[in-house]
């Protein structure tokens, strides 16, 4: 590989020099190479922003033309190797990463519940009583005032609801950020902590395109559906949260999975919904009902039929709703369904 030294004259940061080398773009088509996108750099040769970091070759490379922007990068990872989770936990010398789902963002000190010293040896009996008192006071000072206690309770409630709904980590983090924003603006006053937490989680679900209905959240949150909806509209307005209407397509994978339908049915249902959206058949209608009708039609067309009752129970709608949406979709999309 030929290496040339080129000075970048026209750049936003003057007096900055970048060593360039030309690599073949096809060298980075191998899926076994660990790559990471670099958003801040711009290729000085072709002007592309598709810059990747190749940890295997220790280089920063333009994905379009193969220009090597930097080489011989330092490895900032740990010096030890771990081959399973247990080894990783034992050899790690740092705590968990910062998270918004804990009231102190996970930055406070925690005294381990195991009565062992740093060498793994058991602590003597006369030291255990002292360690117990230290552990108790450490838990107390982590939550120093009423606002922190309320935040700790709200985030634990938020985590409980998310766990019951099976929501991923990014949704929980998003909901925690929204709740903290509501606390900073004083939107909690006069409202229940559980209601605001449930509303923040509902907004996070829609923002992350992992939709859950108000009924599903109300069922596990011990808060009335109307209160969640009212609180959601309030915090959305005050926090300037702009969310597009929920797309029925987002419900299809979950409904199809719960009905144990094959991938062909899911793909067919998504295709039906996309055509319906182009003709405006999904606007002004409940997304769950439209998604349920599309899944029902797709299951019949693919020969893996599910009854309207089964689909309605999974989607949380009535059989009448499915029949109405079914009639609209089949008529306007010219779908011939043989029952």
From Swiss-Prot:
Which SMART domains does the annotation name? CYCLIN
Q: What stretches of residues are sequence repeats?
A: 156-239, 250-331
Report TM segments.
none
Record's keyword terms, sorted: Metal-binding, Repeat, Transcription, Transcription regulation, Zinc, Zinc-finger
Q: Which domain of life is it from?
A: Archaea
Q: Does the keyword ATP-binding apply?
A: no
Kindly provide the name given to this protein in its UniProt entry.
Transcription initiation factor IIB
Q: Name the source organism.
A: Methanococcus maripaludis (strain C6 / ATCC BAA-1332)
Tell me the lineage of the source organism.
Archaea, Methanobacteriati, Methanobacteriota, Methanomada group, Methanococci
